[in-house]
Amino acid sequence: INNDLKNIKDQHKYKDSLSHRKLGVHYSEIINNLLNKNNIKKENISAIGMHGQTVSHTKKDNQTISIQIGCPKTLSEKTNIRVVSDFRQDDIENGGEGAPLAPLFHDYVFNKLGAKRAIVNIGGISNISFLTSNNNSLYGFDSGPGNTLIDSWVKDKYNLDYDISGNIAKSHNCIDQLLKNFMMDKYFHAKFPKSTSTEYFSREWLSENLKLLKHNYNDGDVLSTLTNLTAFSIIQGIADNYKNCDEIYVCGGGAFNKTIITEMELAARKRFSKQIILDTTNSLGV
């Protein structure tokens, strides 16, 4: 399925693809196995919420275009459970970005009365949720690249799927001028609401930025810089929009990259005038 999704992105073939149905079947297998494993009766499930797999998320003529695959009808038929889907389009039609979806879930699961808390999900793209637990309005946005640039660089230069625990990046040095150049991108300075995608922060984006400085950098140092970019842009997004934040918790695949976490801690010390609790959501039991 991962290869199918990549081919869809590369070839720009979306809902007419067989993968639209295949993903629905895949989701149904996961759900059916989960219910069976935990002895949960289907009649006790009110509905399945499915937002699908995003294959394109762009802006054109100041209009957000967000396309997901994963057939809700197939999922419903294979599980015999009602499915609620296409969450993003209603938000887009009402002036929103259609992403990220995570804040509602994060607020429900991680809200703690009085806590000044932000939740960071590091997937391909990083998104931040600012919770309502301190009389705030719930909001969130994409802070920038998460794993996408790191993973693509590691794949191209080391033939690995990802930098395990951030070990390669840890053994190299961040290139300060290159990081500054990355951070000059207009997205990092745009006000929320805002969202982005791996179509924007892509191999092409990285290649163009490397060309600007006309320097033959060490592969490991570029990787270290990309890791710092993820960490720094997250902390900048929090510090610029939630100065009273006391707690930051990280989830998603990037939470396993110890170097991202370490660089986030270092960046937080520089941006905040107080001690910030920074940990993964594992410490909250999730």
Question: Where are these predicted regions, by residue range?
Answer:
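Conserved ATP-utilizing enzyme core subdomain
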Residues: 139-231, 235
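Short glycine-rich, Thr/Ser-proximal phosphate-binding strand/loop in the N-terminal lobe
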Residues: 1-17, 137-138
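Phosphate-binding/catalytic loop of phosphoryl-transfer enzymes
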Residues: 59-66, 77, 81-161
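Structural motif
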Residues: 46-47, 118, 221, 247
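Conserved phosphate-binding/catalytic loops in two-lobed NTP-binding clefts
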Residues: 268-286
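Short beta-strand-loop/turn "lid" adjacent to the catalytic site in phosphate-handling enzymes
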Residues: 11-72
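Glycine-rich phosphate-binding loops at beta-strand->alpha-helix junctions
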Residues: 55, 246-267
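Short helix-loop-beta connector
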Residues: 41-44, 113-115, 242-246
